[in-house]
Amino acid sequence: QKKAQVHIKLDTGMNRIGLRTEDEARQVACALAEAKNIKAAGIYTHFAAADEPMEDGSLNAYSRQQLERFKQLRACFDESIPAHVANSAMSLLAPEAYFSMIREGISLYGYPPVKTDLPFAPALTWRSEIVHIKNISRGETVGYGRIFTAPRDMRIATVAVGHGDGYHRAASNRGEMLVQGKR
């Protein structure tokens, strides 16, 4: 009979889901040890602010605190359970967070989550449709955080793609469009 494979989430400070205390961790560890139909295939956490390094480029104090909390809670479980905590930012800032594997995210698309000298380049192309065209005046702003200011009267277009589609807000005002063969 096959066992269901599960990954155990430890809440180290993001305050979403996961085990928060050593008591909770020990209870789950004991239950897993006795379970005949469940196998822990991994144990992990997620960092709330790993992509916000210190000014010198080092890992911020909150992320270090989360990493230490992970190690404390992780100690309640069998050491043979693979651990994975490093997201894209942690993979660049904290090699001590690699454990058994890392979970690259935004980096896979060619966008560095933190400042780096590594040669990142966008690795995908978006295809969408223009859903709205309008004219704006010089000085008007566009987008979240008013990131773009029109340098002159101009015609702009809204494209049907956004954060919900996986388009990262950090790419705002940096991408290029190709419309009817014109960049």
Question: Where in the sequence are the language-model features?
Answer:
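Functionally critical, mid-to-C-terminal surface segments that flank or help form catalytic/ligand
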Residues: 127-173
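Helical hairpin unit composed of two closely spaced alpha helices linked by a short loop
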Residues: 179-182
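Active-site loop/helix belt of alpha/beta enzymes
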Residues: 2-5, 10-129, 136-137
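Short beta-strand elements bearing conserved aromatic residues within extracellular beta-rich modules
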Residues: 175-177
